[in-house]
Amino acid sequence: MIDRRQFVRYGLGAMAATSLSRFAHADDEDKKVFLDYTQKQLDDAYTQTVWAPNAKQVIDGYARTSEEVRQKLPPTTYSYGSKASENLDVFAPPGARNLPIMVFIHGGAWQMLSKDDSSGPAPTFVGAGAIYIAINFDNMPGNTLPGMVDQCRRALAWVGANARRFGGDPERVYVSGHSSGGHLTAVMLTTDWKAHGAPAQLLKGGVVMSGMGDLAPVVLSVRGKYVTLSPAQVIEFSPMKQLDKANCPALVAWGTLESPEFKRQNRELADALAGRARLAGVFRVRGANHFEVVNELNRPDSELSRATLALMNI
């Protein structure tokens, strides 16, 4: 796992930017590699620090806010698997019983962050009479994208099967996530849960924040240096290609200061969900860059928080 300082310094996903011979930049700098993007333009589109100069401060704030929340609202940690990293933090009101559950999947370009950086939204949900769960999983390079998907699926299946242990309602499990966690959230929302040993209707809704529905441009970008997938896996783990499995409503949110490519990714995912009558709402967070969008859930009075709680019928 790379540390936060390295991650921000090298552009949150552009760790290999000094070794891009595979993309043959020098051969034809004007060649379009995806839509109307040249290679450099596509690399920049998936390098978040190009669009968010305050990235380090915001990311550091995730950990700081999370620590403050845990001091005031200590969670209970459970294991959902056999590995030390396979655990999750449960934040619940005192005397919780049969409450709706929001599970959060952290971002970090599939390379960094953890449940310990993801406690910020807990007061919003606990204060509304719900349970908030931040899940942990292994990041790259020690893990693969298929491995992350497997861990997230097992974590959600565990939550559904064990909800009553911590006062939750197994019939009211929701999922949310930001950035690469937004992608993983969309994968969870397009999972055939019955094929994975869980109830077909395990999830009742979700919130995708600044995610990615199509991995094709991701693997063509600088991130393709570490997000290594076969053509079949690109399709398998692209939610846009698996929408026939979506069986619950979802909110989609992104910031107005995000890269045009991330706006496109989220807008097209929202449009596709709408086409299948699975879109619960769209939120363009005004004045927010990629990293700031998720902080909307830290404020109970934000439009996104209110819509999320309404999605959960609370």
What are these regions (language model features)?
Residues T49-G95:
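N-terminal cap/lid segment of alpha/beta-hydrolase-fold proteins
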